[in-house]
C-alpha cells in the first residue's frame, strides 16, 4: 500500500533554561520524520528517531490535587500525557496546561533562583503519564533543539 500523505509533524512543549538560568517553555514541532518500515516485511510508517542514548522509563500517576513545588526535572526527559491534565509553570511566569496525547521535553536542569518549574494536576482526575528519562547532558539556551 502506497502512503500518499504529506510528511507529518508532532507538537511538543520544551521546558528549557536560557542563558540567564531562567526556565522557559515554548511549543515546537518534531519534523524529521522518515517513511520507512521497521523491518523489511513491515509496511512503511513515519518515524522521527532521536539520537541513541540510555533511557529509563517510569509510568507515573499524579494524584488528584497533587502539586510539585519548584523543582527541576532530574534529567532531560520526554513526558507523554496519557489521561487527565496537568500544568507546568516556568520561572518566566508562563503556565501551560497539557492533556492526553500532549508531549513535553523537560530540560530545566541548572536554573538559578527559583528552581526549575512548578507542576500539578488540573481538574477532577489524576494525571497518568509515561516519562522517558534520557542519559544525556542537558543544554542551555537551545530551545526547540529536538527536530
Protein language model regions, located:
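A short hydrophobic beta-strand segment most commonly corresponding to one strand
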Residues: 105-109, 117-139
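Short capping micro-motif at the N-terminus of alpha-helices
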Residues: 25-28, 89, 98
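Short acidic-glycine-tyrosine-enriched beta hairpin
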Residues: 91-110
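Short acidic, Pro/Gly- and aromatic-enriched capping/linker segments at domain boundaries
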Residues: 2-17
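Short beta-strand segments in beta-sandwich/barrel cores
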Residues: 68, 85-89, 103
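A short glycine-rich, His/Asp/Glu-containing loop-to-beta-strand
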Residues: 17-70, 76, 126-127, 132-135
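Glycine- and acidic-residue-biased ligand/ion/polar-headgroup-sensing regions
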Residues: 74-92
